[in-house]
Design a protein with these regions (language model features):
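Cysteine-centered motifs
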Residues: 6-9
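Long, charge-dense
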Residues: 94-142, 349-369
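Histidine-anchored nucleotide/phosphate-binding helix
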Residues: 73-89, 308-319
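C-terminal catalytic subdomain
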Residues: 302-397
Length: 456
């Protein structure tokens, strides 16, 4: 087992690998695909599709699964991971949730999401210490894809388990959905961010923020994605990764979550097809700018503004100038999932791009934590509309003073819930007894909303 990685070398030259793995994957392909804007896949359908793909892959001796964490619970990645474990048994030796910078999963969350998969095979990703660098995307390429906005080298970093574990199959499992950092979530983001390191995560987030979130959300082939794809092609092609991608959205007619697609393959095509379907079912072009948007954050999933600000990202292109976003966040207890990022958010706040870029230029601690700087940009309305957070009232919740200190308004969750009859609201447009129109969203992580004036 190698002790450390040559930081300036490609991994395939720096380590004594199982050579057969390097040449096993001669061609790329789709192993399974099923999905449309009317498809409704059951858990049994997902199991059948996964098993069909695994049969095509042939015998595998040591398998690693990389699903998302509990923040992606609706993705069905938990069930698919359990199905993979049922298929491979003891040959599925490790499960590494793609935490990125998120807090590790609790035993209760693991049981809820992954069923009977043994807790003993779960590993916890440490984005600050557990990574190796496969290679560097050159600054010239970064400058090319960002239209000159940035020109630093980008490190392709992954958890060391991927390269030291001698796996002959790595299943990267997750949901493709609009995303604020990369345009559309999943595919190789699950690898380079979900199991990535501090520098790689920081710089990828900053690329997206500086290039412009609204230029990227809902697009599959963004500058950040191009950087990831470069890394996949040049530095990670030897890793036996197969992507298992779901498309899940809220069915507006039934009011229930529906699985619209399952795509399994080992190259960009699997992601591209899933992303195309996602934009059909996860995206809504609103007929007019929204003056008031009310978003509910499920307390089992959203405990920080790091995650809860999806309510800002996913609705910003739909909200009218001078409008208001009200976020009901009963479990809100922190700003960042990571303690250092939490401290930086408290110190610098969500005060817009010019303020954040100035602070970044002047403060080394932000320069060393560019994902935090990017998040501060993403989480601001740039003064265009008001953002009101309504946390719960338990001792662990963020206080009114804490909410207001970072640039948000504070709202009383009980008063807002009563005023807008929240338990009775339906998805989308609602008209209150006094004639006020509001737009309600029960889970911002599942969609993207925009008005044509702000989405080209």
């Amino acid at each position: 087992m190698p002790e450390k990685l040559c930081q300036n070398c490609f991994y395939i030259v720096s380590f004594p690998l199982n050579v057969s793995l390097l040449f096993e994957k001669i061609s790329t392909m789709m192993y399974f695909e099923k999905g449309s804007a009317t498809t409704d896949l059951t858990p049994e359908d997902l199991k059948t599709g996964l098993y069909e793909a695994l049969e095509k892959l042939g015998n595998r001796q040591k398998v690693l699964a990389i699903p998302p964490d509990f923040t992606r619970y609706p993705s069905h990645a938990g069930e698919l991971t359990e199905f993979a474990w049922q298929y491979y048994g003891d040959q599925l030796t490790d499960v590494l949730p793609a935490l990125g910078t998120h807090t590790g999963m609790t035993d209760e969350q693991i049981t809820t999401m992954f069923g009977q998969v043994p807790k003993s095979i779960f590993r916890v990703h440490d984005w600050r210490h557990d990574v190796v660098t496969l290679g560097y995307v050159p600054g010239e390429y970064v400058a090319e894809v960002t239209e000159g906005a940035l020109s630093f080298d980008w490190p392709a970093q992954v958890n060391k388990l991927l390269v030291e574990g001698n796996f002959d199959l790595i299943l990267s499992i997750g949901q493709v959905v609009p995303h604020e950092v990369v345009g559309m979530a999943n595919y190789n983001k699950n690898i380079f961010v979900g199991t990535g390191g501090q520098e790689g995560i920081n710089k990828s987030h900053f690329i997206g923020a500086v290039y412009g979130m609204e230029r990227m959300m809902g697009r599959a082939n963004t500058p950040v994605r191009k950087v990831f794809n470069y890394a996949s092609e040049h530095f990670a092609a030897h890793l036996p990764i197969v992507y298992v991608q779901t498309v899940v959205a809220l069915n507006k007619e039934t009011g229930k979550l529906q699985t619209y697609g399952l795509f399994i393959g080992d190259d960009f095509e699997v992601f591209d097809k899933a992303a195309g379907l996602s934009m059909q079912v996860n995206f809504e072009m609103v007929e007019k700018p929204l003056k008031k948007v009310l978003v509910w954050l499920d307390p089992s999933e959203f405990k920080s503004t790091w995650l809860g600000n999806k309510s800002v990202y996913r609705t910003r292109m739909a909200i009218a100038d001078g409008g208001e976003l009200i976020v009901l966040a009963p479990a809100l207890r922190e700003f960042g999932e990571d303690k250092e990022i939490d401290r930086l958010i408290r110190k610098y706040g969500y005060f817009g791009t010019p303020h954040t870029l100035k602070a970044t230029n002047e403060n080394e601690e932000l320069q060393q934590n560019l994902s935090a700087a990017a998040h501060l940009i993403h989480g601001s309305s740039e003064g265009r509309f008001a953002i009101t957070y309504c946390p719960g009232k338990n001792p662990e919740n963020l206080t009114k003073e804490e909410i207001e200190s970072v640039g948000f308004r504070w709202g009383d969750i009980d008063e807002i819930t009563e005023k807008y009859h929240v338990p009775t609201l339906k998805e989308g447009w609602n008209v209150m007894p006094d004639g006020e129109e509001i737009f309600y969203i029960s889970n911002p992580a599942l969609g993207l909303w925009a008005h044509k004036d702000r989405f080209n």
